[in-house]
């Protein structure tokens, strides 16, 4: 219940207005009232006597004197003495009156009446009582009734908004607080605990919350503290941590509101007791140290404070000091002259029923009922009596007593000087927007004790207010402003008039700083309940006014005294001739007896008229408007005449002084020059370092990413963002409109479906009402129509139609569907709103990111100064412009170099391709990837450009308009970019030239303006050494020099100011012009961008239309090609049959000859066996053979052949080729390969030197190179048509061809072993390759190797070619992997996919690849009969066949069918 054992001690003095401190009751003696002792305090805290350490219904007895037993010792008198026996007190509580208390020794009998008390200890000196004590003694009689208690008023909570909680929460907390405390202003600890426990938080958390909330440490909560506790509970409930200490903002708000509530409590002191300005607690200042402290006179308890005391911790009322006296006949431990007499305590003349009863002193055996009957907290012992050297005083454990005003209660957080209200007053009176509204004094008024004098803190606050309102620093505040300021205090006009009169004693109509402070202090006092004085107190008179008034008064008194003395002495009539001077007696420093006597002041001044002869005016020596030089002071020595020697001596001394001054000036000028030189060197070195750093920045690789014009880019992005944001509402409205249309369409669709499902339903009724609604008339008509239909059906014998559904079913179905549609629409609408909200949030985030971060006025000024060269000197401006020009030049140069290097690299990769294709017909050399040193990216880029060029050519041949971008060649693009760079350079040079012209113009204007002035401006040059003044003593010359120098300086300043103004104007104009130009450029760029986007859209549309037309033409061409291929296939089949018959006949003849010649067959046997065995094996194991290519690669590297790179690159290129889905692209590659191979057959042997021979030994390696070279070449239709005309050459086969065929037959014979069946199969199997279809891909030596491995596996390339939509040139594309998978895929070759119809027709006539019966369609393209046996297995046979050239001729001859097919596809 009690916060501590001493808490109620401190609370008594404040919680009980009008009650004196505990244990301080005035004594009563037989002496008259005038001889009573003055109330004195010893400086120690008041401490009660006689309470035990335990709390019970009755207090335990506590003796005073020596400690015996369990009670604490309390000894009387001097600290060194102690009574022989103990006294015992019994205390109990009985409210509101106190029972009598008996003190003393047992033998004494105490009369019921009051006895005369005597002070213990040494005899005290009596002192007269104060007037307040005398006045209070009359009102302490028993007949005086206590004043009526003040009316109870409910708890008043200031209308102040707490920032850390919401307005709704604050209103709820106010209601809860009022319901809990009733009329009180605070909530006790138990009630607060009960409320806080409802939060179900652990006790440790609630303990922390209580410690943070109880800011006053009083064990009770004011409303702001209660609201803070609720706020902290909410923080902990929501999972957030409690702060270790309250934030300053929250702490200030809570303490300020607590102070307002505390000061707003009405004063409970009796109305009749008038208070003085001097607080009663200043008594220690008047204390007489030699006299013992006199207890203060008690004041009656005011029962009206019970309502407040009920809300606070129970605190006992104070007793008067119990002076325990010794009997006179008992030996005193204090000495013979220190006998103590018994004394009574209590009020004299009061009845037993009112307040304290008389307490006779008596024996120890008599019980002494004291104080309370209720439980009391333990109190520490306190020695009574007086001693000058008290050292055993126990003061530990006492809490600090808060200050307050009698009549108030509770703990008040009031500062030692001033009150928090003054801060509120300052905030109220500070100039702020909207102050013209109504004024309120909420939180300003109070009843604080405010002295007349102004403290330093208050003066500082008033001075801050004055400076805040004195914006122009006039030093005073006018009447209008003062009315506005003082009107905000809310005082009456009469009070403000009186305050103004007191503050402005001189009636000037304005207030200076001191007078304003006086006015504010008077307002502050008035707000705290003090009346406005009629005259200004001396403490409030400003020091300046007081000193001035004192000085004026002193002068007046001096004048009056002087006049009286002159009148008395007769000097008043003729003061000049009296010869007596009274000036020394009239000094302000106190006259002749003052310590400063002898020093002259204004009272001792006397004008010397005789010295006027030595005065020489300098007015006639003034030149121009120069200021008048000070006249040489007249000295007393000028009256004396100097001798010639003295004059010469003075001249010499003056000359020496002038020489010294000249020397100093020269040294100073030299030092300045040295400093200037050093500064210039440092500036130049700094500029050089800056240039180097700028060059490093410009030449850094990442300098391209540096944003030079970040602001312009931000502005353009903000404009784009705004444009997009403006489109959002339009798009949202379109979406909503479409949603409505969809909903209407769904509803209409449902009506139609419902009408179909329920023909006779009422939903089929056509509404004629507004908006198509069905009316009752429409339903009646529908029912009548239905009855007519039913009757007609009965008459006609038809079945009666189903009964019409009731209207409710149709309506219900329609409503259900409408509800579902509406739900979908609402869902979509919610999604649309979510999208809009997300777009808005995204837009806000983008706007925040695009804002000028950190852009302040200072930063903008610095940027304009150091980037735009505004407001700097000419040298710095030129330096900044040079840096900017160098940066722009470096940026443009770097762009040109990067583009030039990129173009050179592109050209270097593009130029070798056509050269190689022209030099070598070999497919391996026709690709950019075959060049030594070329990378994969270069090869891909070159192939892409060639493909684009070929596509453009094909589109042009097909009559399609090519894309504008593709039509622009590399040279044209380079030319265009070069022109653009030149244009940018030209614009940059023009801007630089304009800036230079502007700068030159400003310099010329400055020179012109300075030339007009009489003196030449010094500029930046160091000042020259001052001229020597030796031999020049004329003061007129000095004046002229000085005047000329000042005129020069004035002219320089004027010229410089004019130049600065002109420069600023020019800079502003230049800045505006640049901004306008930048804006125009941005607008032009935006327009160009829009136009470019429009052109791109148009071109994309053209390309799309072109593609569509191209696809249509392609389909038509494919159809025509298919028909042509079918015809050609039939013709080819017929020609093949004829040729097969011829070959069969020729082979039979050769076989007969071989049978006769065994030796020749034996020699040829091994050759035949090897190809026959190896060919199928290789065809099946083609993937495993492919790794053998690197084996030949090192050989080629050692030989230095350029095909080394191509041997490694083919797989990658082949992958690109196989992934391509463009049939034209593949056909072009195949046609190009055939063209390249067939065009130069004759130079082949010469080109394939030993290197080529060595390289061609590996057929798979050649195959890979062939496939690699294919993607890079494109064939043309004319060559294919030419190849289609070659079939007739097959009929005219030469002897060389027969020899080649015979060699093939020999090769095929060996596997047969001489059997007729095997021979026939070999003969028929070898007939397929000679077909014209097979010779297409075998024109080049590299091709000859490919057919070799393809002859047995003729079907392998065909499926691959069909699958990839390539023409007869399909065999090359499949590298190692395809062959292995082809045999399984071979059966499907007969029905090839639609993209490869050309290959399908040739397939049926021949048959399967390896078997002789049905030569597969792919066999012709993939494998040529003659080269097959000679090339794949046996390298020597392959080389022999290549060197002969006859096989090549035969292959070229058989290219007709294949080329014709390809030509048709391409056309």
Curated annotation (Swiss-Prot):
Ranges of Polar residues composition bias in the record: 50-75, 129-139, 305-314, 340-370, 1171-1182
Feature: compositional bias, Pro residues: 292-301, 1369-1381, 1389-1430
Sections of the chain in a coiled coil: 634-758, 965-1162
Domain EF-hand: 201-236, 491-526
Protein's cellular compartments: Cell membrane; Endosome membrane; Cytoplasm, Cytoskeleton, Actin patch
Biased composition (Basic and acidic residues): 892-912, 935-953, 973-1009, 1054-1087, 1101-1129, 1136-1153, 1279-1288
Main location: membrane
Topology in membrane: Peripheral membrane protein
GO CC aspect terms: actin cortical patch; endosome membrane; plasma membrane
Keywords: Actin-binding, Cell membrane, Coiled coil, Cytoplasm, Cytoskeleton, Endocytosis, Endosome, Membrane, Repeat
Positions of the UniProt region annotated as Disordered: 1-157, 266-376, 613-643, 822-864, 888-1087, 1101-1467
GO molecular function terms attached to this record: actin binding; calcium ion binding
Domain EH: 169-257, 458-547
Biased composition range(s): Acidic residues: 1154-1165
Compositionally biased region (Low complexity): 25-48, 77-101, 919-934, 1183-1197
Domain WH2: 1434-1451
SUPFAM superfamilies assigned to the protein according to its UniProt record, in alphabetical order: EF-hand
Listed GO biological process terms: endocytosis; endosomal transport
Subunit structure: Component of the PAN1 actin cytoskeleton-regulatory complex.
Function: Component of the PAN1 actin cytoskeleton-regulatory complex required for the internalization of endosomes during actin-coupled endocytosis. The complex links the site of endocytosis to the cell membrane-associated actin cytoskeleton. Mediates uptake of external molecules and vacuolar degradation of plasma membrane proteins. Plays a role in the proper organization of the cell membrane-associated actin cytoskeleton and promotes its destabilization.
Family from the record: Belongs to the PAN1 family.
Protein name: Actin cytoskeleton-regulatory complex protein pan1
Name of the gene: pan1
